[in-house]
């Protein structure tokens, strides 16, 4: 029996996701300039032709990986705001998901940081990254302000506290490939360490 359009769409989405996952690993190691479509195909154990069925160039793949990473970060912050708990518990919930995910599968986070900081990043991708990052920071700020109003987060300039919180998370993301081995660390960071920055 022929597959339904719904089944075909699901297969297309799965294959696209497989391409992006493989690409995220390669871009995290090699950057945009050092990556070829052939590298992504080898990493994902797929043909170059399959990749070109979904993307016209490696730049398109890179943009899609960055978009997925940014949307994941924003969606997590939005979900944290909706949790039925206190503001500090919302922040803890966010970190309990984000930190292990970033620690054990760091590729998307590393590509996101690369997109924000590398001169190789196409201008339109950089603008998308900056805009989406701004939205995520606004959500972090909202969580912090709620915490201040509840007396759970230290008083002070919420913009500076947001900066410190985001910088801590990004610092962990950027160091995940080398610092754990250097320090002999086993396991993802304890959310409580990050929360100490904010606790009243």
Q: Which stretches of residues belong to each language-model region?
A:
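Hydrophobic alpha-helical bundle segments that form small-molecule/ligand-binding pockets
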Residues: 82-84, 122-123, 134-161, 200
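Helix-turn-helix
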Residues: 18, 26-60, 64
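N-terminal intrinsically disordered/low-complexity leader segments
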Residues: 1-14
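Short coil/turn segments at alpha/beta junctions that flank glycine-rich nucleotide-binding fingerprints
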Residues: 29-33, 83-84, 105, 150
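Short secondary-structure transition hinges
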Residues: 99-139
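Hydrophobic/aromatic-rich alpha-helical bundle segments in the mid-to-C-terminal region
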Residues: 109-113, 123-126, 130, 148-194
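Generic hydrophobic, amphipathic alpha-helix propensity
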Residues: 15-23, 40, 65-69, 73, ...
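Hydrophobic alpha-helical connector segments
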Residues: 64, 78-107, 161-165, 188
């Amino acid at each position: 029996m022929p597959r339904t359009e719904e089944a075909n769409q699901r297969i297309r989405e799965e294959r696209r996701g497989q391409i992006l996952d493989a690409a995220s690993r390669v871009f995290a190691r090699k950057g945009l300039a050092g990556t070829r479509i052939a590298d992504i195909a080898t990493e994902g154990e797929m043909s170059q032709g399959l990749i070109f069925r979904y993307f016209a160039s490696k730049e398109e793949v890179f943009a899609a990986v960055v978009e997925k990473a940014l949307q994941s970060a924003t969606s997590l912050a939005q979900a944290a705001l909706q949790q039925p708990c206190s503001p500090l518990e919302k922040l803890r919930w966010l970190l309990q998901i984000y930190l292990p995910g970033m620690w054990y599968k760091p590729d998307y986070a590393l590509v996101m940081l690369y997109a924000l900081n590398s001169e190789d990043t196409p201008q339109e991708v950089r603008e998308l990254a900056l805009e989406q990052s701004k939205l995520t920071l606004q959500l972090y700020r909202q969580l912090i302000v709620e915490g201040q109003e509840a007396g759970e987060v230290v008083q002070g300039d919420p913009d500076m506290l947001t900066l410190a919180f985001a910088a801590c998370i990004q610092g962990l993301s950027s160091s995940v490939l080398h610092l754990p081995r250097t320090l002999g660390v086993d396991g993802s960071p304890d959310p409580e360490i990050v929360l100490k920055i904010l606790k009243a």
